[in-house]
Regions:
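Conserved functional hotspot residues or short segments at active or partner-binding sites
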Residues: 10-197
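Short, small-residue-biased leader/transition segments that mark boundaries at the very start
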Residues: 2-7
Length: 197
Protein backbone atom coordinates (compact mmCIF):
# COMPACT_ATOMS: atom_id res chain seq x y z
CA UNK A 1 0.00 0.00 0.00
CA UNK A 2 1.39 3.59 -0.41
CA UNK A 3 0.63 4.67 3.13
CA UNK A 4 4.18 5.76 3.91
CA UNK A 5 4.21 7.97 0.78
CA UNK A 6 0.94 9.63 1.65
CA UNK A 7 1.52 10.32 5.33
CA UNK A 8 5.12 11.59 5.22
CA UNK A 9 4.34 15.18 6.11
CA UNK A 10 1.61 14.34 8.61
CA UNK A 11 4.20 13.15 11.15
CA UNK A 12 4.17 15.48 14.18
CA UNK A 13 1.50 17.68 12.65
CA UNK A 14 -1.39 18.38 15.04
CA UNK A 15 -4.92 17.68 13.78
CA UNK A 16 -8.17 18.35 15.61
CA UNK A 17 -9.97 15.38 14.09
CA UNK A 18 -9.86 12.67 11.44
CA UNK A 19 -11.91 14.96 9.21
CA UNK A 20 -9.21 17.67 9.43
CA UNK A 21 -6.51 15.10 8.70
CA UNK A 22 -8.34 13.72 5.65
CA UNK A 23 -9.12 17.22 4.35
CA UNK A 24 -5.44 18.19 4.57
CA UNK A 25 -4.48 15.00 2.74
CA UNK A 26 -6.99 15.67 -0.06
CA UNK A 27 -5.81 19.30 -0.33
CA UNK A 28 -2.20 18.16 -0.62
CA UNK A 29 -3.14 15.58 -3.27
CA UNK A 30 -5.08 18.21 -5.26
CA UNK A 31 -2.15 20.65 -5.09
CA UNK A 32 0.21 17.99 -6.44
CA UNK A 33 2.30 17.67 -3.27
CA UNK A 34 2.26 13.87 -3.43
CA UNK A 35 3.37 13.77 -7.08
CA UNK A 36 5.95 16.55 -7.38
CA UNK A 37 8.38 17.95 -4.82
CA UNK A 38 8.18 21.39 -6.49
CA UNK A 39 4.56 21.63 -5.34
CA UNK A 40 5.54 21.53 -1.65
CA UNK A 41 6.04 25.02 -0.23
CA UNK A 42 7.02 26.20 3.23
CA UNK A 43 7.12 29.87 4.23
CA UNK A 44 10.63 31.13 5.11
CA UNK A 45 9.34 31.94 8.60
CA UNK A 46 9.19 28.18 9.33
CA UNK A 47 12.86 27.53 8.44
CA UNK A 48 15.14 26.53 11.29
CA UNK A 49 18.81 25.44 11.22
CA UNK A 50 19.74 22.40 13.30
CA UNK A 51 22.47 23.09 15.86
CA UNK A 52 24.69 20.07 15.24
CA UNK A 53 24.64 19.59 11.46
CA UNK A 54 23.29 22.96 10.34
CA UNK A 55 20.60 21.34 8.23
CA UNK A 56 17.46 23.24 7.29
CA UNK A 57 14.27 21.90 8.86
CA UNK A 58 10.79 23.38 9.02
CA UNK A 59 8.72 24.15 12.10
CA UNK A 60 4.94 24.32 12.23
CA UNK A 61 4.24 20.62 12.10
CA UNK A 62 5.03 18.03 9.48
CA UNK A 63 8.35 17.23 7.84
CA UNK A 64 9.97 17.73 4.46
CA UNK A 65 11.79 14.53 3.47
CA UNK A 66 15.41 14.69 2.31
CA UNK A 67 14.38 12.68 -0.74
CA UNK A 68 11.04 12.90 -2.48
CA UNK A 69 9.39 9.81 -3.99
CA UNK A 70 6.25 10.73 -5.94
CA UNK A 71 3.16 8.55 -5.78
CA UNK A 72 2.57 6.71 -9.04
CA UNK A 73 -1.19 6.90 -9.43
CA UNK A 74 -1.14 5.14 -12.83
CA UNK A 75 -0.67 1.70 -11.24
CA UNK A 76 -4.01 1.82 -9.44
CA UNK A 77 -6.43 1.62 -12.37
CA UNK A 78 -10.22 1.87 -12.36
CA UNK A 79 -10.39 -1.87 -13.06
CA UNK A 80 -8.29 -2.66 -9.97
CA UNK A 81 -10.18 -0.12 -7.88
CA UNK A 82 -13.47 -1.78 -8.88
CA UNK A 83 -12.14 -5.24 -7.96
CA UNK A 84 -11.24 -3.87 -4.54
CA UNK A 85 -14.44 -1.84 -4.15
CA UNK A 86 -16.70 -4.78 -4.99
CA UNK A 87 -14.83 -6.99 -2.53
CA UNK A 88 -13.55 -9.31 -5.27
CA UNK A 89 -9.91 -9.23 -4.11
CA UNK A 90 -10.83 -10.17 -0.53
CA UNK A 91 -13.43 -12.75 -1.59
CA UNK A 92 -10.99 -14.42 -3.98
CA UNK A 93 -8.25 -14.50 -1.33
CA UNK A 94 -10.54 -16.03 1.30
CA UNK A 95 -11.81 -18.71 -1.09
CA UNK A 96 -8.29 -19.53 -2.25
CA UNK A 97 -6.97 -19.88 1.30
CA UNK A 98 -9.90 -22.01 2.46
CA UNK A 99 -9.44 -24.31 -0.52
CA UNK A 100 -5.66 -24.62 -0.07
CA UNK A 101 -5.00 -23.99 3.65
CA UNK A 102 -3.60 -27.46 4.42
CA UNK A 103 -1.45 -27.48 1.30
CA UNK A 104 -0.12 -23.97 2.03
CA UNK A 105 0.61 -24.82 5.68
CA UNK A 106 2.52 -27.97 4.70
CA UNK A 107 4.43 -26.38 1.85
CA UNK A 108 5.31 -23.08 3.55
CA UNK A 109 6.12 -23.67 7.20
CA UNK A 110 8.06 -20.40 7.34
CA UNK A 111 7.17 -17.05 5.82
CA UNK A 112 10.61 -16.71 4.19
CA UNK A 113 9.92 -19.80 2.08
CA UNK A 114 6.46 -18.51 1.11
CA UNK A 115 7.82 -15.07 0.24
CA UNK A 116 10.56 -16.53 -1.95
CA UNK A 117 8.63 -19.30 -3.72
CA UNK A 118 4.89 -18.61 -3.73
CA UNK A 119 3.66 -17.17 -7.03
CA UNK A 120 0.24 -15.90 -8.08
CA UNK A 121 -0.23 -18.02 -11.21
CA UNK A 122 -2.34 -17.65 -14.36
CA UNK A 123 -5.08 -19.98 -13.07
CA UNK A 124 -5.52 -17.86 -9.96
CA UNK A 125 -5.69 -14.70 -12.06
CA UNK A 126 -8.24 -16.24 -14.44
CA UNK A 127 -10.42 -17.13 -11.44
CA UNK A 128 -10.06 -13.58 -10.11
CA UNK A 129 -11.17 -12.11 -13.46
CA UNK A 130 -14.16 -14.48 -13.60
CA UNK A 131 -15.18 -13.52 -10.07
CA UNK A 132 -14.89 -9.87 -11.09
CA UNK A 133 -17.21 -10.40 -14.07
CA UNK A 134 -19.77 -12.13 -11.82
CA UNK A 135 -19.66 -9.15 -9.46
CA UNK A 136 -20.20 -6.69 -12.34
CA UNK A 137 -16.57 -5.62 -12.79
CA UNK A 138 -16.14 -5.38 -16.56
CA UNK A 139 -12.75 -6.68 -17.68
CA UNK A 140 -10.40 -4.10 -19.22
CA UNK A 141 -7.25 -5.65 -20.70
CA UNK A 142 -5.17 -2.46 -20.77
CA UNK A 143 -5.98 -1.50 -17.18
CA UNK A 144 -5.56 -5.09 -16.03
CA UNK A 145 -2.06 -5.34 -17.52
CA UNK A 146 -1.07 -1.99 -16.00
CA UNK A 147 -2.31 -3.01 -12.56
CA UNK A 148 -1.15 -6.64 -12.74
CA UNK A 149 2.08 -6.28 -10.69
CA UNK A 150 0.15 -4.51 -7.91
CA UNK A 151 -2.74 -7.01 -8.06
CA UNK A 152 -0.31 -9.94 -7.73
CA UNK A 153 1.49 -8.29 -4.83
CA UNK A 154 -1.78 -7.48 -3.08
CA UNK A 155 -3.11 -11.03 -3.44
CA UNK A 156 0.13 -12.54 -2.15
CA UNK A 157 0.22 -10.07 0.76
CA UNK A 158 -3.37 -10.88 1.76
CA UNK A 159 -2.63 -14.61 1.68
CA UNK A 160 0.47 -13.99 3.82
CA UNK A 161 -1.61 -11.97 6.29
CA UNK A 162 -4.08 -14.82 6.70
CA UNK A 163 -1.36 -17.45 7.13
CA UNK A 164 0.79 -15.30 9.44
CA UNK A 165 0.05 -11.69 10.43
CA UNK A 166 0.21 -8.01 9.42
CA UNK A 167 4.02 -7.94 9.58
CA UNK A 168 4.21 -10.49 6.79
CA UNK A 169 1.51 -8.63 4.85
CA UNK A 170 3.65 -5.49 4.84
CA UNK A 171 6.81 -7.42 4.05
CA UNK A 172 5.15 -8.56 0.82
CA UNK A 173 3.48 -5.23 0.02
CA UNK A 174 6.69 -3.28 0.61
CA UNK A 175 8.53 -5.23 -2.10
CA UNK A 176 6.73 -3.05 -4.65
CA UNK A 177 6.38 0.10 -2.52
CA UNK A 178 8.64 2.62 -4.25
CA UNK A 179 9.00 4.81 -1.16
CA UNK A 180 10.12 1.89 1.01
CA UNK A 181 12.51 0.57 -1.64
CA UNK A 182 14.03 4.05 -2.17
CA UNK A 183 14.34 4.53 1.60
CA UNK A 184 16.21 1.21 1.96
CA UNK A 185 18.50 2.13 -0.92
CA UNK A 186 19.26 5.56 0.57
CA UNK A 187 19.69 4.36 4.17
CA UNK A 188 22.19 1.75 3.01
CA UNK A 189 24.18 4.22 0.91
CA UNK A 190 27.41 5.99 1.87
CA UNK A 191 25.91 9.29 0.72
CA UNK A 192 23.20 9.29 3.38
CA UNK A 193 25.62 8.16 6.07
CA UNK A 194 27.69 11.28 5.35
CA UNK A 195 24.62 13.51 5.79
CA UNK A 196 24.17 12.24 9.33
CA UNK A 197 27.75 12.85 10.48
Amino acid sequence: SAASDVYKRQIQKPYGSTVDYNKDLIDRFNHGELMNADSIHFPDSLKVQTKKLGRTVYGGGGIMPDYFVPIDTTLYTDYHRNLVGKGVIIKFTMQFIEGHRKELANKYKKFESFNEKFVIDDNMLATLREMGEKEGVKFNEEQYQKALPLIKTQLKALIARDLWDMTEYFRVMNTTNESVQKALEILNSDEYGKKLK
